[in-house]
């Protein structure tokens, strides 16, 4: 399941805008917003170091955390963050306010196992079409990843979402077709064709 929860301390922001955001960043803080759950959005400031540490720890987008805003604790799920394209530090984060029964759409990573029990062991190449899959799931019960078992797959075989054993309470956002997650191809054809395959599915 998703990684252990975390808590970040924040302060409410009264001033917003580019000038305010630049001032925050000079002081080691980043602007962020908490929205959703039929409540007014809250603009906040967070420690750049603490947020960056959480992002690099992994599982940031699939882990419910707590933000302490001037003493008020709010359960949140990160929905988006922006990185500086040059210096790779966090510039802004959007958080969704959640409760125990909140349903969310989350991109969940795909992990593969038992490659040695498939034709990959004789030279087949795993062509991954989807590295993540978007699911509907409860905010407090988000899987860390979904696992695809490659046992017995031959060159030319494909893995579709219907072949994957999914945890309880999660359903794919794409529900109108049995989309492909990966294929095993012959070595000569082992160039990833994600863009082509995805385009043909959309």
Curated annotation (Swiss-Prot):
Keywords: Ribonucleoprotein, Ribosomal protein, RNA-binding, rRNA-binding
Gene Ontology CC annotation, any one: cytosolic large ribosomal subunit
Pfam families in the record: Ribosomal_L25p, Ribosomal_TL5_C
GO MF term list: 5S rRNA binding; structural constituent of ribosome
SUPFAM superfamilies per the UniProt record, alphabetical: Ribosomal protein L25-like
Example of a GO biological process term: translation
Keyword Disulfide bond in annotation: no
Superkingdom in the source lineage: Bacteria
RNA-binding recorded as keyword: yes
Region span, Disordered: 1-21
Quaternary structure (record): Part of the 50S ribosomal subunit; part of the 5S rRNA/L5/L18/L25 subcomplex. Contacts the 5S rRNA. Binds to the 5S rRNA independently of L5 and L18.
HAMAP family according to UniProt: Ribosomal_bL25_CTC (MF_01334)
Function description: This is one of the proteins that binds to the 5S RNA in the ribosome where it forms part of the central protuberance.
Family as reported in the entry's similarity comment: Belongs to the bacterial ribosomal protein bL25 family. CTC subfamily.
NCBIfam families: bL25_bact_ctc, PRK05618.1-2, PRK05943.1
Record-given protein name: Large ribosomal subunit protein bL25
Native source species: Agrobacterium fabrum (strain C58 / ATCC 33970)
Gene (UniProt): rplY
């Amino acid at each position: 399941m998703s990684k252990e929860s975390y808590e970040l301390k924040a302060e409410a922001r009264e001033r917003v805008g580019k000038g305010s955001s630049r001032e925050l960043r000079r002081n080691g803080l980043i602007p962020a917003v908490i929205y959703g759950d039929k409540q007014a959005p809250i603009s906040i400031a967070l420690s750049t170091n603490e947020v960056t540490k959480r992002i690099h720890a992994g599982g940031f987008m699939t882990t419910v955390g707590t933000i302490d805003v001037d003493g008020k604790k709010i359960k949140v799920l990160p929905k988006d963050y922006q990185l500086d394209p040059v210096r790779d530090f966090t510039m802004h984060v959007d958080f969704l306010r959640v409760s125990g029964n909140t349903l969310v759409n989350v991109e969940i990573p795909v992990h593969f196992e038992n490659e040695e029990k498939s034709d990959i062991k004789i030279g087949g190449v795993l062509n991954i079409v989807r590295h993540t899959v978007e699911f509907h799931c409860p905010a407090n019960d988000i899987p860390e990843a979904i696992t695809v078992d490659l046992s017995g797959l031959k060159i030319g075989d494909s893995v579709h979402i219907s072949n994957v054993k999914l945890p309880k309470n999660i359903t794919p956002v794409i529900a109108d077709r049995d989309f492909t997650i990966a294929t095993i191809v012959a070595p000569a054809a082992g160039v990833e064709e994600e863009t082509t395959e995805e385009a043909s599915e959309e």
